[in-house]
Swiss-Prot record:
The lineage of its organism: Eukaryota, Metazoa, Ecdysozoa, Arthropoda, Hexapoda. CDD domains: Peptidase_C19E. Interacts with atms/PAF1, but not with CycT. The gene is Usp36. Residues 121-138, 479-494, 561-580, 740-750, 963-974 have a biased composition (Low complexity). GO terms for molecular function: cysteine-type deubiquitinase activity; K63-linked deubiquitinase activity. It comes from Drosophila sechellia (Fruit fly). Required for maintaining multiple types of adult stem cells, including male and female germline, epithelial follicle cell and intestinal stem cells. May function as a transcriptional repressor by continually deubiquiting histone H2B at the promoters of genes critical for cellular differentiation, thereby preventing histone H3 'Lys-4' trimethylation (H3K4). Controls selective autophagy activation by ubiquitinated proteins. It catalyses: Thiol-dependent hydrolysis of ester, thioester, amide, peptide and isopeptide bonds formed by the C-terminal Gly of ubiquitin (a 76-residue protein attached to proteins as an intracellular targeting signal). This is Ubiquitin carboxyl-terminal hydrolase 36. Its EC number is 3.4.19.12.
Length: 1059
C-alpha cells in the first residue's frame, strides 16, 4: 500500500522557509533579482530547507496507510499553499515554463502558437468544484461519483435473457400519436429496454398505480411489459395520466411535438432516478450525468473557438443527449454530419469572446417545416468525428439504426406521427398507433425521418467492451446517440449514372479561422491528448484509412445509393483498360440479375450519352475486356432526332450487308456511339461497355463535312433527277423519317442500277441516321379552280391500302406491276404532288412505307375540328380545308390521293381526278367510280352529322335529360322534358300495401298523364307540347349547340338509284 508521511513539528519550519524564500524574492528590487530564472529560485528554496535539515531529520515521523497518495496528500498540500508573486510569470507552483508536452507556455495559458490551453489556476473557482483538475484541456473532467456504471449497460437484444417480441400497437386516445410514436421508438432501443426490465427490485416497491404519484421509470417498465405480453393494442394510460408530471404546459388532447415530448420524458426519467438518492440536490452536474439515461443517450461535444482579434483559444465541453442536424444544405445524413462538425467562421457579433465581449447567435427560427428529403443508411460511421486517443482511433465507431419517428404532414402545426422499430431478428416494423405491419429495409431508408435512434454496433468492434483498456464513456462504446433530423419522404434514391469524381484529400477542413466541433469521450485510465479524426467515410466492415491515398492502392468511394464501387490499381486484372478512362455505366432494369462492375476513375464528370437511335436485332460486340452477358435483344427501330455532327456517305457505295463495315468487320451503331460519346450507352436493355479504350472499327476514309452542305448537295441532286425514265421500279420515299421499314437481319440487296435516280442523301451522325428529302413547290392557295393538272400518260402509283371512311389506315402496297412509258404527274390544289418513286436506299439498312402525300401531320391539318367542344379553328389557327372548300372538290382530292373504293391501287391507264374531268379511254369507268365515291362520301357525311346531332356535346349551354322515346316517327308525340326513368324512380312505392302488389300502379302507364298534368304550364308555352313553333326552337337549339352551319340536303333514294 502506498504510504504518506505526516509532518507534525516541522510543518512550521517548512512553512517559514517557504515564506522567507518567497518573501525575499518578492522584496528584492534589484536588476539581478529580477533576472533570476526558475532554477535560481529553486536553489534558494533548497538552501533554506537544507539549513534546517538537522531539525527535520531529528523530528518524530509518523506513518499511516492511505488508499491513494495523490488524493490524500498532494491535494491537501496544494490547498494549503498560496502563490504570492512568482518570480517567473510562466512558473506556477514551482513548475518551469514548459508544459507536459514540452512546449513553451506563455502567461496567458497557451503556447506560442496559441493552440493549447494551460492548466487552470489553482485558485480558480472551478478547481474547488472539481477536486481533480486536468492539465490537458482535451480530456473530460472526471466525476466524483458514478451513479450507474457504464459496464452495466447491455447493448443489443441478445444481451438479455428475455425473449423479445415485436410488440403490440398503442391506441390513440385523442391526438396522442406523438406520444405513441415516441414510446414505440424508445421501447425498441435495446439498451433502454434491457435497463427497464432489469429494474425489478425497484418495480416491486414503487407505487406507480396511485394517480399523481410514482416514478415515470416504473410506468415505462410496465408499459414495455404490457406491449410484450398482450396480443392486442394497449392503451398507454400510465404515461398519458402523468402528462402534467412530465411537462406542465402540455395539455391532454392537444397536438404536441414528438421531439419536445421526448426531451421532457427523458428528463422526467432522470429526475425519478435521482430521487432515489437522499442528497441528489447536492450532486454536481457531472455526477448527475452518470444516470442510466445519461449513460445511454448522453455524450459531450468538444468545441474549440479561436478569436481572430486576440488569438485566444477557448475549448469547451457541452453535454448532449441528441444531435440537432441542419439539413438545409445537406442531401444525405453524412452531409449533415459533415456540416455539423466542420469548421465555420463566426461573423461579427457571432461569439462572445472573453476579450472582445461579443456574443454568439447560432440558430435561427424558421416558421415552416423543412420539406426536404435526405438519404441515410442503416449504419453510420462516426469514427472521423470522435475525439479519442490514438489507441482507440484504430477501432471503428459504427452505429446501426434501431428505431425512428416519422412525421406525415405538410406543416409543423398538424400531421400524424408514426414510428419504426427493429426486433431481435433484424427486421423492422411500422407502428401506426394500433396498427403494426412489417416494413422492408428499402422502405425504411425512404421513410420520412424526423427522429432517428442509432445504437453502437458491437459486431464492428475489434474487442469486447469489458476488455478495453481505456474507460470510454457514453457514445464511444456503450451508448446510443439519438440523431433527430426533420426530413420529407421522396422517391427512392436513383443509382448514380456517370463517372465518379475522386475523393478529396485526407483532411476535410480547409478554413483555419473557424470553429471545430467533435464528439468527446471520457478517458479513465489515460491522460494523453485526444485527436480529431479527419478521414473520409469508410466501409463499416473495414477500419478507417489513415493519411492520404497511396498510389496504386485500392480505394473506395461511396455512391449515392450506398453501393460502394471499387477502383482497382493499374496492376489489376483489368489491365487492358486505363484507369483514367474507367467510368460508370448505366444500369438497366432488365439486367438486375447480372453482376456488373462499375469502375470509377478520376476523370471529369460528363453528361450521359444520347440513347442509340438505330438498333438492329444483331448482338453488338463488346470491345472491352470486361465480360458482359447480353440478353436476346428486341428489335426497336428508332431514328435520330437532330444531327449535331454528321459525316458524308453520299458518295460511298452501299454495302451488301448493312451490318458490315467497309473494312469487312461487323459493327453496330451502339459500338460506334459508345466510343465517341461520354463512354456509356444502353443497347436493347443490356449493359455494354463504352469506355474510351474500346476498339471501334470506323471507316477512316470518310470525309466529315458539315450537315448543311450535305443537305444542299442532296437537294441539288434531287432536282437534277426529276425527269422521267422509261423503266422505273416503284419504291417508297422517306419524307418525315418516322416510319421505318421492318427489315430482316440477313437481308441484302444489290446496288441500284445506274438508271435509277439516286435516293436522298443519308447522313450518319452520332445521334443516328438522317435522310434528307426535298419538298416540292410551295403550296398554292386553295380555291375553287380545276382540281387536277394532267400531263402525259398515266402511270402506276403505288399507294397504301386506304378507304374513304378512314383515310389514315394503311397497309403494305400491292404487288408491283410493270411500268408503262410516259409518266403522268398530278398536281392538286393543296400543293402536294405525287412524284415518281425511286429505288429504296439499302445501304443504311432500312426503308419507309409511307408516301409523300401520306403524312399524318398533313392529314391532321386538313381535318375538321367539330366535336372538340366549342367551335375552334385548325391547329395552325386557320379554318379547316373541309369547311372552306366545296364538298365535291374535297371528295375529288381524296379520290385522287387515296385510291379506289376497294382500297386497292388504281388500275393501269386510269386516274380519277373529278366527276367531270378525265383524260383516258376508260372514262366511263372512272366517272362511275368517282360518282360512287362522291355519293358514298355524302352519305357518310350526313351520317356523321346525324351522329353529331344525336350525341352532341352540351358544352355547358344546355341541360341534358334522358328521353325514353325513340327519335323517329313518334318523336313528335313525345312529351318535352319527360323522363320515364326519373318518373318511375320518383313515384316508386316500396311498401307492398294494396291489392295488386307493390308496383301495380306503374304498369298501367298512368304516370305519363300525371307528368303532363303537373308540368302543363312548364312545357306548353307555345300552344301545345307538339306545336310547330316549339319543335323549331328545339331543333334550332340543337343545331346551334352542334357548332352552327347547315348540312347539305341528303339525296333522295331515286337519285341514288339513278347514279
Amino acid at each position: 500500500m502506498p504510504v504518506s508521511m505526516a509532518v507534525c513539528e516541522t510543518a512550521n519550519v517548512v512553512n517559514a522557509a517557504l515564506r522567507e524564500s518567497l518573501g525575499g524574492n518578492s522584496s528584492a528590487g534589484s536588476s539581478t533579482d529580477q533576472a533570476k530564472s526558475g532554477e535560481d529560485t529553486n536553489g534558494s528554496l533548497q538552501n533554506h530547507i537544507v539549513a534546517n535539515a538537522k531539525r527535520i531529520l531529528m523530528a518524530k515521523i509518523e506513518y499511516e496507510e492511505v488508499p491513494n497518495y495523490h488524493e490524500s496528500v498532494l491535494e491537501n498540500l496544494k490547498s494549503k499553499y498560496i502563490v504570492i508573486k512568482p518570480g517567473n510569470p510562466g512558473a506556477i507552483n514551482g513548475f518551469s515554463g514548459k508544459n507536459n508536452t514540452g512546449k513553451l507556455v506563455g502567461a496567458n495559458g497557451h503556447d506560442n502558437n496559441g493552440a493549447r490551453k494551460q492548466a487552470e489556476h489553482p485558485n480558480n473557482q472551478s478547481h474547488h468544484n472539481h477536486p481533480h483538475p486536468t492539465s490537458n484541456p482535451n480530456e473530460l473532467p472526471k466525476p466524483k461519483r458514478v451513479l450507474y456504471p457504464r459496464e452495466n449497460i447491455r447493448i443489443g437484444w441478445k444481451q438479455s435473457e428475455r425473449k423479445w417480441q415485436v410488440g403490440t400497437g398503442m391506441i390513440n386516445v385523442g391526438n396522442t400519436c406523438y406520444l405513441n410514436s415516441t414510446l414505440q421508438a424508445l421501447l425498441h432501443i435495446p439498451a433502454l429496454a434491457n435497463w427497464l426490465v432489469s429494474e425489478q427490485a425497484h418495480l416491486a416497491d414503487c407505487n406507480v398505480a396511485e394517480p399523481g404519484s410514482g416514478c415515470i421509470i416504473c410506468a415505462m417498465a410496465k408499459t414495455l411489459l404490457a406491449t410484450q405480453s398482450n396480443q392486442s393494442a394497449v392503451r398507454p394510460f400510465l404515461i398519458y395520466s402523468k402528462l402534467k408530471q412530465i411537462c406542465k404546459h402540455m395539455v391532454v388532447g392537444r397536438q404536441e411535438d414528438a421531439h419536445e415530448f421526448l426531451r421532457f420524458l427523458v428528463e422526467a426519467m432522470e429526475r425519478a432516478y435521482l430521487m432515489r438518492f437522499r442528497n441528489y440536490k447536492e450532486l454536481d452536474q457531472l455526477v448527475k450525468e452518470t444516470t442510466p439515461l445519461g449513460q445511454i443517450f448522453g455524450g459531450y461535444l468538444r468545441s474549440e473557438v479561436r478569436c481572430l482579434s486576440c488569438n485566444h483559444v477557448s475549448i469547451t465541453f457541452q453535454h448532449f443527449q441528441d444531435l440537432l442536424l441542419d439539413i438545409r444544405k445537406a442531401d444525405s445524413l453524412e452531409d449533415a454530419f459533415e456540416g455539423h462538425f466542420s469548421r465555420e467562421r463566426l461573423e461579427d457579433m457571432g461569439y462572445k469572446c472573453e476579450g472582445c465581449k461579443k456574443k454568439l447567435k447560432r440558430f435561427s427560427m424558421i416558421g415552416n417545416k423543412l420539406t426536404k428529403q435526405i438519404s441515410f443508411k442503416p449504419r453510420i460511421d462516426l469514427s472521423k468525428y470522435a475525439a479519442r486517443s490514438p489507441a482507440a482511433q484504430a477501432q471503428p465507431l459504427t452505429y446501426r439504426l434501431v428505431s425512428m419517428v416519422t412525421h406525415l404532414g405538410a406543416s409543423q402545426h398538424c400531421g400524424h406521427y408514426t414510428a419504426i422499430g427493429s426486433t431481435d431478428t433484424g427486421s423492422f416494423y411500422n407502428f401506426d398507433d394500433s396498427y403494426v405491419r412489417p416494413i422492408t429495409m428499402q422502405n425504411v431508408c425512404n421513410t420520412n425521418a424526423y427522429i432517428m435512434f442509432f445504437e453502437l454496433d458491437l459486431s464492428q468492434a475489434a474487442s469486447p467492451p469489458a476488455n478495453r483498456p481505456n474507460g470510454v464513456r457514453l457514445t464511444n462504446g456503450h451508448s446510443t446517440t439519438p440523431v433527430p433530423a426533420a426530413t420529407v419522404s421522396s422517391p427512392s434514391p436513383t443509382r448514380f449514372i456517370g463517372p465518379q469524381l475522386p475523393p478529396g484529400g485526407a483532411n476535410g477542413y480547409t478554413n483555419g479561422n473557424a470553429q471545430k466541433t467533435a464528439i468527446q469521450f471520457k478517458q479513465q485510465n489515460q491522460q494523453n491528448g485526444l485527436q480529431l479524426g479527419t478521414g473520409k467515410f469508410q466501409d463499416t466492415a473495414k477500419p478507417p484509412l489513415v493519411g492520404a491515398y497511396a498510389k496504386g492502392e485500392a480505394t473506395s468511394a461511396p455512391t449515392a445509393n450506398g453501393n460502394k464501387s471499387s477502383s482497382p490499381s493499374s496492376n489489376s486484372s483489368s489491365n487492358h483498360k486505363s484507369i483514367n478512362q474507367q467510368q460508370y455505366l448505366p444500369i438497366s432494369s432488365d439486367d438486375e440479375d447480372i453482376d456488373d462492375e462499375m469502375k470509377p476513375g478520376p476523370t471529369t464528370a460528363q453528361l450521359p450519352s444520347m440513347p442509340n437511335m438505330t438498333e438492329d436485332n444483331t448482338e453488338p460486340k463488346a470491345k472491352s475486356p470486361v465480360k458482359i452477358h447480353l440478353k436476346t435483344p428486341v428489335k426497336t427501330p428508332l431514328k435520330s432526332l437532330v444531327p449535331y455532327e454528321s459525316a458524308s456517305e453520299e458518295e460511298e457505295a452501299p454495302l451488301p450487308n448493312p451490318r458490315q463495315s467497309p473494312g469487312g468487320e461487323d459493327f453496330s451503331e451502339s459500338d460506334q456511339e459508345s466510343g465517341q460519346t461520354n463512354g456509356h450507352s444502353k443497347t436493347n436493355g443490356s449493359l455494354t461497355n463504352g469506355s474510351a479504350s474500346s476498339s471501334v472499327h470506323v471507316n477512316n476514309s470518310k470525309q466529315k463535312t458539315d450537315a448543311i452542305d450535305e443537305i444542299f448537295k442532296s437537294l441539288k441532286k434531287s432536282a437534277d433527277s426529276e425527269e422521267d425514265d422509261d423503266e422505273e421500279e416503284p419504291s417508297i420515299q422517306l419524307t418525315n423519317g418516322w416510319h421505318p421499314q421492318k427489315q430482316s437481319q440477313s437481308q441484302s440487296k444489290a446496288p441500284p442500277s445506274p438508271k435509277t435516280p439516286p435516293s436522298p442523301a443519308v447522313i450518319k451522325s452520332k445521334t443516328g441516321i438522317w435522310k434528307v428529302t426535298r419538298k416540292d413547290e410551295v403550296d398554292a392557295i386553295d380555291d375553287d379552280d380545276d382540281a387536277v393538272v394532267v400531263e402525259g400518260a398515266p402511270v402506276k402509283i403505288p399507294t397504301p391500302n386506304k378507304t374513304h371512311r378512314n383515310p389514315f389506315s394503311s397497309s403494305k402496297p400491292s404487288t408491283d406491276s410493270p411500268a408503262t412509258p410516259g409518266a403522268k404527274r398530278q398536281k392538286l390544289l393543296n400543293g402536294s404532288a405525287l412524284k415518281s418513286h425511286q429505288q429504296p436506299r439499302v445501304g443504311n439498312g432500312y426503308q419507309s412505307n409511307v408516301t409523300s402525300n401520306g403524312s399524318t401531320v398533313n392529314e391532321l391539318l386538313k381535318q375538321s375540328y367539330r366535336g372538340y367542344g366549342a367551335s375552334v379553328l385548325s391547329w395552325n389557327g386557320k379554318p379547316a380545308e373541309l369547311e372552306k372548300e366545296p364538298f365535291e372538290l374535297v371528295c375529288a382530292k381524296r379520290i385522287a390521293g387515296h385510291g379506289s373504293v376497294e382500297g386497292s391501287d388504281i388500275v393501269e391507264g386510269s386516274v380519277a381526278v373529278d366527276a367531270a374531268v378525265t383524260s383516258s379511254s376508260n372514262s366511263n369507268d372512272v366517272v362511275v367510280i368517282a360518282v360512287a365515291l362522291l355519293v358514298d362520301a355524302r352519305e357518310q357525311r350526313q351520317r356523321d352529322l346525324d351522329d353529331d346531332e344525336e350525341n352532341e356535346m352540351d358544352r355547358g349551354r344546355q341541360r341534358k335529360v334522358k328521353s325514353g322515346s325513340a327519335k323517329g316517327n313518334n318523336a313528335s308525340n313525345s312529351t318535352p322534358g319527360y323522363n320515364p326513368f326519373q318518373e318511375y324512380e320518383g313515384q316508386k312505392r316500396w311498401n307492398k300495401n294494396g291489392g295488386g302488389g307493390g308496383f301495380s300502379r306503374f304498369y298501367n302507364q298512368n304516370y305519363r298523364q300525371n307528368f303532363q298534368q303537373r308540368n302543363k304550364f312548364k312545357f306548353n308555352r307555345f300552344g301545345g307540347a307538339g306545336s310547330a313553333k316549339f319543335q323549331q326552337q328545339r331543333a334550332l337549339q340543337r343545331h346551334l349547340s352542334a357548332g352552327g352551319g347547315f348540312s347539305r340536303r341528303q339525296p333522295s333514294a331515286q337519285q341514288q338509284q339513278q347514279t
